[in-house]
């Protein structure tokens, strides 16, 4: 199964997040979703929205 370019991390993106290196701290009020479907030693962080 090959995903389309840019859609490699569907689970993370569905939650509105992006993959970051594991060392990055997700600063509140961002959410840290953990690894999700990001690559090894990365994690999914959702940056706070402007709403």
Swiss-Prot record:
<dbReference type="GO" id="GO:0015459">
    <property type="term" value="F:potassium channel regulator activity"/>
</dbReference>
<dbReference type="GO" id="GO:0044564">
    <property type="term" value="P:envenomation resulting in occlusion of the pore of voltage-gated potassium channel in another organism"/>
</dbReference>
<dbReference type="GO" id="GO:0090729">
    <property type="term" value="F:toxin activity"/>
</dbReference>
<feature type="disulfide bond">
    <location>
        <begin position="12"/>
        <end position="44"/>
    </location>
</feature>
<feature type="disulfide bond">
    <location>
        <begin position="19"/>
        <end position="38"/>
    </location>
</feature>
<dbReference type="GO" id="GO:0005576">
    <property type="term" value="C:extracellular region"/>
</dbReference>
<keyword id="KW-0528">Neurotoxin</keyword>
<comment type="subunit">
    <text>Monomer.</text>
</comment>
<comment type="similarity">
    <text>Belongs to the crotamine-myotoxin family.</text>
</comment>
<keyword id="KW-0964">Secreted</keyword>
<dbReference type="InterPro" id="IPR000881">
    <property type="entry name" value="Myotoxin"/>
</dbReference>
<dbReference type="Pfam" id="PF00819">
    <property type="entry name" value="Myotoxins"/>
</dbReference>
<comment type="function">
    <text>Cationic peptide that possesses multiple functions. It acts as a cell-penetrating peptide (CPP), and as a potent voltage-gated potassium channel (Kv) inhibitor. It exhibits antimicrobial activities, hind limb paralysis, and severe muscle necrosis by a non-enzymatic mechanism.</text>
</comment>
<keyword id="KW-0959">Myotoxin</keyword>
<feature type="signal peptide">
    <location>
        <begin position="1"/>
        <end position="8"/>
    </location>
</feature>
<keyword id="KW-1015">Disulfide bond</keyword>
<keyword id="KW-0632">Potassium channel impairing toxin</keyword>
<keyword id="KW-0800">Toxin</keyword>
<keyword id="KW-1220">Voltage-gated potassium channel impairing toxin</keyword>
<keyword id="KW-0872">Ion channel impairing toxin</keyword>
<keyword id="KW-0929">Antimicrobial</keyword>
<dbReference type="InterPro" id="IPR023355">
    <property type="entry name" value="Myo_ane_neurotoxin_sf"/>
</dbReference>
<feature type="disulfide bond">
    <location>
        <begin position="26"/>
        <end position="45"/>
    </location>
</feature>
<protein>
    <recommendedName>
        <fullName>Myotoxin-4</fullName>
    </recommendedName>
</protein>
<keyword id="KW-0732">Signal</keyword>
